[in-house]
Amino acid sequence: MFTVVETSIFQKQWPMYWTEDERGAFAAELAVFPGSGVVVKESGGIRKVRWKRKGTGKSGGVRVIYFVWNEAEEVVRLLIYAKSEIDNIKGPALKEIRRALED
């Protein structure tokens, strides 16, 4: 099982979309299935997963951007957003976010 950690950006964003229980349920899912999201093209391995939120299905829910750090057995949650707010974040931009976090 992987450890799930969050960036400071994610910590500020999640309360806009989830309850504490929803956040915990998602973390539990990622800990067991870290490869559940699709790899975003040209992102250097960053993944995106759709997740439902109360009152919506997956298509109306949120998108969570994360990467799996296999060596440390960690899943790092980077960003969360509603699809209605942001259509897509391109791979090269996500790659830059990851590089900044690794420095």
Predicted regions and their residues:
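Arg/Lys-rich, positively charged N-terminal/basic patches that mediate binding to nucleic acids
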Residues: 1-22
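Residues that recognize and position ribonucleotide moieties
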Residues: 3, 47, 87
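Short, intrinsically disordered, mixed-charge
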Residues: 19, 32, 99-103
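Short, solvent-exposed recognition patches
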Residues: 21-29
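A short, surface-exposed loop/turn module that caps and links secondary-structure elements
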Residues: 28-58
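Short beta-strand micro-motifs in enzyme catalytic cores
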Residues: 45-49, 63-64, 76
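A short, structured beta-strand/loop element
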Residues: 54, 58-73
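Enriched for short, Lys/Arg-rich terminal
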Residues: 68-103
